[in-house]
A protein has these predicted regions:
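Conserved Nudix-box catalytic region and its N-terminal flanking loop in Nudix hydrolases
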Residues: 32-76
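Active-site-adjacent beta-strand/loop module that shapes the phosphate/pyrophosphate-binding cleft
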Residues: 87-105
């Protein structure tokens, strides 16, 4: 979808989704597994439970971003993230279209 044209060169500009990462952290084994969640401090969905995560910075590797976001939001130092899912529903975030990459950390 073309969103605009460059005023200088006339080329089309395209809107692209932003990339976010979510950390899935578990502990325990068998039937007593626990999952680490945070309570969102800001809109959208303020006060709701969520996986720790956030936006990937420009030039940042998503695997580095998920480790950074996990540390920033929980104080937990993760390592060796493993990609487990991708979620691209345009309605997931009311602010903008995001592609969410889920990592087991």
């Amino acid at each position: 979808m073309v969103s605009d044209s460059c005023h200088h060169c006339g080329r089309d500009s395209y809107r692209s989704p932003s990339v976010v990462v979510d950390a899935v952290v578990t502990r325990g084994s068998g039937g007593s597994k626990e999952v680490l969640l945070i309570r969102r401090g800001h809109e959208p969905c303020k006060g709701m439970l969520a996986f720790p995560g956030g936006f990937v910075d420009y030039g940042e590797d998503p695997e580095d971003a998920v480790i950074r976001e996990l540390k920033e939001e929980t104080g937990v130092q993760g390592s060796n993230p493993i990609s487990i899912a991708v979620h691209g529903d345009p309605s997931r975030d009311p602010r903008k279209h995001v592609i969410a990459l889920f990592y087991l950390v």
